[in-house]
């Protein structure tokens, strides 16, 4: 539990062998430190004159301790030799470098760490269940042996592990994620002839992840994997797409109100309120996968006009929604406030047409958590969205309560482009567009329960997102954040006229496609008419 030296006043522990006349001289120094804190440099010094051989051997054993200091070897004379062996064990930590003309060997065991502070040269480096951190400097070694070892590098620098001789064993390589692009030409581990080292690792830079790959020359490089998005890439893509996801869910919620009025025998318009929410899973064209958990409330009022050939329904609504987003190690949220206007036309022959328009304002925030301890970066921006929807269909009834309602719907949405920064790096998102088509059929049955009328139904639909080319850019790289393609939706719901002046409705849907899955999406509403 002792402290040797001080952080601002390091001591130097050294061994020296010198000889001038005939014969030779040898000096051995064995240092063993346990459960201590050491602020000291180590020096192995050997001096010879008149071709007299001198040898200095220093053996430094550190266990369960923190050591801050450098290790040096120094030879003076053609017959001088200095040897330095450093052995760290049992979760010891060393902060320092190795330099000099003599021989130096470093061994780390049982959870020990060497934080290299300057360019270091050793003859042999052995790592067992321990870590070498070369983020600050390069290490040159003659041989390298690793058993469950860890190498920490800075992939945005050119600090490397250079092995001139044989390298063997297994090694995990970590580099903290960053927003900087990685030089794929830098060999972060170079090996000598007949090496059998197996090294693996993944990091991220800019929009993509980089996998540690062994080249044809036997050296190891970080190579960009364009099929794996980085945390920063996933977040900026999700933040571009999430407001569109929320806006489309709000459009579905408003459509549920229009459907409920059409199914009701008593609803002549009035005041209504709906809760809506759902769990969504999306994957963009740029390989960003994210989950979105949305909850919201919509409040509206409308009136129904009866005509000779049917009816009109006109109304307005406002909604508030929040979507909690998670992607990779990062998270964020989207808050939206929207205003809606809608108009429905119902004909006595069963044909109906629904239209709606919306304007929304969306606030987006996120915490980008870079992999491998790269830190957390905050991002935020606001945007506005404009959307419209048209739906047409036909209601067939058999006169005994059964009804079938085929329909087709097309909705379009555009979000304003935005510019913001991630830790000083420019991010640009183009206008984000969504053009969503849907065709389906609703099958239900109408029956009475006491004084109430209940209409349960099943719904089956096919959807397709047509919009593509929604680009986002981080620095000098860009990626497609679109979620296009087909999906299928199956759901069930019920509409009930509880009294002459009150109704209620609810629906629950499941949607699945190649790039989308909504395992749960629902609406619950109540309306009062007069």
Report residues per predicted region.
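Outer membrane beta-barrel translocator domains of Type V secretion systems
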Residues: 226-400, 509, 514
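Outer membrane beta-barrel transmembrane domains
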Residues: 398, 414, 423-530
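Repeated loop/turn-to-beta-strand initiation elements of outer-membrane beta-barrel proteins
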Residues: 38, 67, 94, 307-314, ...
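Extracellular beta-solenoid/beta-roll
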Residues: 39, 51-223
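Transmembrane beta-strands of outer-membrane beta-barrel proteins
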Residues: 271-273, 312-316, 341, 351-357, ...
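Solvent-exposed, glycine/polar-rich loop segments of beta-barrel outer-membrane systems
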Residues: 235, 239, 285-292, 328-335, ...
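Outer-membrane beta-barrel pore domains and translocons
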Residues: 74, 276-278, 317-323, 346, ...
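Transmembrane beta-barrel domains of outer membrane proteins
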Residues: 164, 261-263, 293, 300-306, ...
